[in-house]
Structure formats: C-alpha cells, structure tokens
C-alpha cells in the first residue's frame, strides 16, 4: 500500500478510528466503478485509518440461505473465512427474507446504526469512517456527531446520497485509482468485463488476435455470478 496517498480531509494522528463497512453497498459500488470487487480488507482498513489508532473494522452483510442456493452459501463461507482471518476485523451478518420471490435484507442497516451509536456513546472512538453511500444512515450520523464524534463518509461520488453527503463532517471520495494498490490479487492488463453474463463484455487493454484467455474463476468471481441471480446479495 502506498504511503503517499493524500486523504480528502485533515488527519489528526491522535484520533481513534473505527471503520464501519456496508458490505453490500461497497460491493455494488466497486462493481459499478471498478468492474471488480476483490479488495484486501486489511490493506483497505489501513489505508482508511491512515496511521491513526485503529480500534477495529466492522463488516456487515447478509448471510446467504443455504437452502436457496447451496453453492452460493459455500462460496460466501470461504469469503467470510478470509475476512475472519483479517486482524482487527469483525464480521456482522444479518438475514434475508423473501418478499414474494425476491430476497431482501433484514436488519443490516439497524445493526450498523446500532453499533455506530453504541460505540460513540461508550467513547470507543473519536472518528467513525462509514463506508457507504446510503442516505438511510443520515440520522444516525447526525446523532453520532451530536455525541461529539467526527464522522467521515467514504464512497464513490456517484454512489453517495445527497443526504449523507450533507450530514457528514468529511468525505473520503473513492476512485478506481484509490483501490489500485489494495486489491487482493493482481490481474493482467486484459480482463473479461462481462458483468451481465455476456462473453462479449468490455475488455481492458489490447485484445489478443487469438481466443481471449478467460480470467481465473475464483470464489469472489463465482460470488458475483450468484449475486446477479440472487438479487445481488454479496
């Protein structure tokens, strides 16, 4: 990870930092803006913390239903195992329920807001970094500010709601370049950009005159395909 990155807001070396990651929101933002999502969460947390005392990173998402898609459940378990091995990172999982035939998140936003507020009330951090662009967190952000805490919202500009942008003390704006040195694996210049299960998706780099090499099929790649089928839960 580069030490030369300039953050979008003033950094105080003595402020205690807690990081709250809305996993589904981050996943879809990375898909949209970077066409990949295989972040090294340890390196990501370190970049966000920027050398300040780091209490912990909290990652929130929905637990897949093994009865609905067992392979997707197994792939998610492998992904979660990797997260559990990341130092100072806690995984918090909500459930999903069917609304008709469509699975919807249940309880994840409440989990994030509750931890966000509880830790501020208990004076466990000075600065909270909320990795989400979801405007539903606006009131919780204001409540944390009223407790005397500093709140940084980290998101891609195109995915940051107006309400959340206005209430945050500071913003950390993501770009594809922001993640260039914190991907969990390295790829060559050419990669299939098939994000709609279309083999003729966009390519990066000059195409080979021979049949294009298919990218390695990893757990995260399989997770993406199941996400597209299962209402995009990551």
Where are these regions (language model features)?
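Nuclease catalytic cores that cleave nucleic-acid phosphodiester bonds
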Residues: 81-198, 203
């Amino acid at each position: 990870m580069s030490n030369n990155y300039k953050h979008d807001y003033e950094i105080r070396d003595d402020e205690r930092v807690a990081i709250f990651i809305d996993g589904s929101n981050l996943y879809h933002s990375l898909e949209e803006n970077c066409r990949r999502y295989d972040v090294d969460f340890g390196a990501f947390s370190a970049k966000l913390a920027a050398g300040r005392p780091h209490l912990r990173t909290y990652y929130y998402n929905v637990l897949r239903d093994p009865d609905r898609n067992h392979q997707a459940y197994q792939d998610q378990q492998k992904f979660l195992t990797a997260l559990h091995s990341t130092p100072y990172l806690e995984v918090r999982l909500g459930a999903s329920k069917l609304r008709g035939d469509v699975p919807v998140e249940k309880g994840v936003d409440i989990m994030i807001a509750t931890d966000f507020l509880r830790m501020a009330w208990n004076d466990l951090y000075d600065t909270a970094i909320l990795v989400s662009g979801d405007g539903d967190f606006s009131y919780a952000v204001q409540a944390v500010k009223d407790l005397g805490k500093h709140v940084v919202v980290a998101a891609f500009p195109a995915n940051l709601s107006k309400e959340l942008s206005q209430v945050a003390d500071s913003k950390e704006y993501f770009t594809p370049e922001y993640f260039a040195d914190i991907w969990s694996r390295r790829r060559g210049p050419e990669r299939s950009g098939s994000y709609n299960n279309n083999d003729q998706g966009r390519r990066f780099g000059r195409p080979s005159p021979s049949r294009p090499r298919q990218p390695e099929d990893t757990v995260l790649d399989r997770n993406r395909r199941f996400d597209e089928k299962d209402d995009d839960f990551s």
